[in-house]
């Protein structure tokens, strides 16, 4: 078996046009895979310089392989099983700014640099007032980026054609707005002056993005077989699902510079990210939250098995297509395609997604992912959505604890205040009291849900049915 490097494998040399903060699994399986496809199919002709955002990371392993690695895509594509391996060659080099500060700052001096892409976790986009301009480097990611931008501004004497296009991928709603605000805070803190501020405002663009791809990461259990198949000793293989979506809130002139559409990729440039954020939360996360307790209390442990179950599968379909989809404001055909993609992802034969892992903090999840849909549905249709109501009753039942019919334990996990409340309510043995107490817990919902017409009665009816007939019979009654 060969080592993987540019001596043993082909690596194309391309102009360095992208600075990427982050060397983790997600960026390598998502952004770098996208850039690889743009190079191959849309003549993008760009390479990436990776910057490790924190002092300790994985760039030594990456550099040991000359930044070559494979992406293993697994899942269903239009019903067909796919399990592919692709060598990604887009990263030219990887730097640690803590030990290579000069080389890091020199990136700003390269005239062809055009893009900055980051994923430094949700905590990464934060202002740290202890950062100084002369730090080598500033400790926060926005601090490092401001150092780089200011050096570029000075190097090219405020040349308006040398601005950078910045795409943060951190999982924060309107991440671009947050990053921009933080850079303004550093401009203020470090007294970088109005001229630089004007250059940043006019020559650079920081755009909000929404990313979506499940990336399990390094394939520990399959790695021996993968290496055998590749005949390379690749220690940076990254596994991901086939589905990918990148929504970028930016004008068409930015899209023209980043021609992902020409490579047939699911990268959308849109005037507003908000409806896509809402679509993901509603049609991907929303069904997850209600299918999990329904599945588990029906004796099903894995999301894929829930989708394939003759009763629970129909329940999931009803919640998605007949209830939640009716509450969104995007074109119907687009929503249906997205929902079918979601079901294909839930059905992934390679990922054993345990429903219990989704059950963590179910009440706050229902509040953000399903409650808005329940209210909108009631408003638009004049009646309650049966599946979403049953989902709430299933969560309440799950929090009773105990054991399933097959002897498996039911172990809820949530904020202590919620756990204590449910324990106390179920101790009464009275489903009317349980319902009223849960719906009236304003510390969970921010309001009293007993005031929603018909909700308390419908939840109690479901709780009684689950106790008397079991979960599957209760689900059958609404299909």
Predicted regions and their residues:
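Substrate/ligand-engaging "lid" and interaction regions
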Residues: 1-479
């Amino acid at each position: 078996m060969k080592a993987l490097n540019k001596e043993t494998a082909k690596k194309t040399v391309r102009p360095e046009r992208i600075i990427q903060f982050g060397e983790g699994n997600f960026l390598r399986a998502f952004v770098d895979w996208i850039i690889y496809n743009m190079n191959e199919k849309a003549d993008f002709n760009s390479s990436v310089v990776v910057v490790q955002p924190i002092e300790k990371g994985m760039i030594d392993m990456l550099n040991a392989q000359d930044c070559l690695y494979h992406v293993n895509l697994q899942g269903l594509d239009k019903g067909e099983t796919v399990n592919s391996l692709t060598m990604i060659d887009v990263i030219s080099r990887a730097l640690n700014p803590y030990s290579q500060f000069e080389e890091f700052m020199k990136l700003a001096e390269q005239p062809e640099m055009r893009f900055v892409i980051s994923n430094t976790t949700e905590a990464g986009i934060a202002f740290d007032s202890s950062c100084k301009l002369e730090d080598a480097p500033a400790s926060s990611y926005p601090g490092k980026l401001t150092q780089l931008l200011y050096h570029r501004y000075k190097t090219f004497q405020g040349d308006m054609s040398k601005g950078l296009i910045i795409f943060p991928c951190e999982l924060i709603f309107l991440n671009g707005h947050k990053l921009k605000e933080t850079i303004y805070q550093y401009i203020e803190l470090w007294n970088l002056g109005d001229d630089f501020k004007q250059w940043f405002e006019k020559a650079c663009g920081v755009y909000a993005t929404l990313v979506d791809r499940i990336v399990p990461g390094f394939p520990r259990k399959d790695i021996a077989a993968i290496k055998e198949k590749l005949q390379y000793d690749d220690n940076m293989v990254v596994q991901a699902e086939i589905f990918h979506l990148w929504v970028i809130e930016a004008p068409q002139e930015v899209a023209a510079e980043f021609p992902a559409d020409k490579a047939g990729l699911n990268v959308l440039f849109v005037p507003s990210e908000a409806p896509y954020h809402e679509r993901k939360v509603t049609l991907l996360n929303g069904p997850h939250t209600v299918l999990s307790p329904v599945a588990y209390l029906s004796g099903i442990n894995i999301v894929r098995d829930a989708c394939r179950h003759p009763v629970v599968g129909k329940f999931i379909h009803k919640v998605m297509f007949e209830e939640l989809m009716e509450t969104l404001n995007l074109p119907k055909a687009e929503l249906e395609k997205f929902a079918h993609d979601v079901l294909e992802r839930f059905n992934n034969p390679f990922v054993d997604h345990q429903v219990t892992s989704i059950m963590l903090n179910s009440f706050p999840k229902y509040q953000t992912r399903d409650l808005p849909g329940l209210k909108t549905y009631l408003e638009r249709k004049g009646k309650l959505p049966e599946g979403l109501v049953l989902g709430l009753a299933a969560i309440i039942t799950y929090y009773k604890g105990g054991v399933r019919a097959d002897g498996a334990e039911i172990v809820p996990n949530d904020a202590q205040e919620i756990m204590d409340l449910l324990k106390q309510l179920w101790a009464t043995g009275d489903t009317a009291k349980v319902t009223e107490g849960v719906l009236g817990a304003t510390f969970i919902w921010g309001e009293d849900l007993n005031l929603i017409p018909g909700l308390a009665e419908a939840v109690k009816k479901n709780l009684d049915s689950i106790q008397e007939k079991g979960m599957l019979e209760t689900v059958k009654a609404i299909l």
